[in-house]
C-alpha cells in the first residue's frame, strides 16, 4: 500500500476557488495546513458526498511522517477545531452569510479512517471549478516548512499567470495571519526571510 499511495501523491493536485485564499488559516501549524490541503485534495469534485479517507493515505498525502497514531489523531482533531473557528463569509451590501467548509468530520480509530463531508452551501469552492481558481501540486506545498511560506505559496499560485502579485501591507498581514505586534523588522526576519528561503 505504501508504494501505491506515494505514487498517487506525486501527481496529486489541490484545486479550489480563489475566494478561499481570502480565508487566513489562523493559528494552523505547518502540519495542520498540510492535512487541511490533503483533505481538500480528496474532496475535490466529490460534490457533497461523504468521503472516507484511510489514515495511511492521508498521512502520505500530507507528508505526515515519524509520528505516533495518537499524535496523528490529535492533529486531526486540532485541524477540525481550527476549521470550526474559520468561517467563510459571503457579503452583499450590509447583508452577509457565514459558513464552515466541512459539516461532517468523523475520526474512527478502529477502522483507521477519517470520514468527512463538505458543506452543501460551499460545494462550489472545491467542485465544478472552471474559472478563478488556485491550483498547485500537493507535494510542493507539503515540502515547505514555514506556515508563512505555505500561505504565500498558495497566494502566489493564484497569480502565477499574471506574473506579479501586489498587496497592501494590511492585507498581507491579514492573509498570512501575521501578529499585529510584529513591526516591519519582525516581518522581514520572521516572515519574509523564511518565505524567500523556501520559495
Regions found by a protein language model. Give the residues of each.
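Charged, alpha-helix-forming regions
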Residues: 1-198
Amino acid at each position: 500500500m505504501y508504494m501505491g499511495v506515494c505514487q498517487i501523491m506525486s501527481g496529486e493536485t489541490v484545486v479550489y476557488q480563489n475566494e478561499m485564499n481570502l480565508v487566513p488559516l489562523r493559528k494552523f501549524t505547518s502540519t495542520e495546513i498540510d492535512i487541511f490541503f490533503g483533505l481538500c485534495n480528496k474532496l475535490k469534485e466529490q460534490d457533497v458526498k461523504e468521503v472516507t479517507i484511510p489514515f495511511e493515505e492521508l498521512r502520505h498525502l500530507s507528508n505526515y511522517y515519524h509520528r505516533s497514531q495518537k499524535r496523528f489523531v490529535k492533529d486531526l482533531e486540532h485541524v477540525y477545531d481550527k476549521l470550526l473557528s474559520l468561517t467563510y463569509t459571503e457579503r452583499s451590501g450590509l447583508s452577509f452569510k457565514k459558513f464552515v467548509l466541512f459539516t461532517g468530520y468523523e475520526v474512527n480509530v478502529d477502522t483507521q479512517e477519517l470520514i468527512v463531508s463538505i458543506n452543501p452551501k460551499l460545494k462550489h469552492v472545491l467542485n465544478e471549478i472552471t474559472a478563478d481558481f488556485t491550483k498547485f501540486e500537493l507535494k510542493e506545498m507539503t515540502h515547505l516548512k514555514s506556515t508563512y511560506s505555505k500561505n504565500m505559496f498558495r497566494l502566489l499560485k493564484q497569480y502565477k499567470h499574471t506574473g506579479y502579485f501586489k498587496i497592501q501591507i494590511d492585507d498581507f498581514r491579514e492573509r498570512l495571519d501575521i501578529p499585529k505586534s510584529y513591526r516591519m523588522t519582525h516581518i522581514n526576519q520572521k516572515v519574509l526571510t523564511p518565505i524567500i528561503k523556501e520559495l
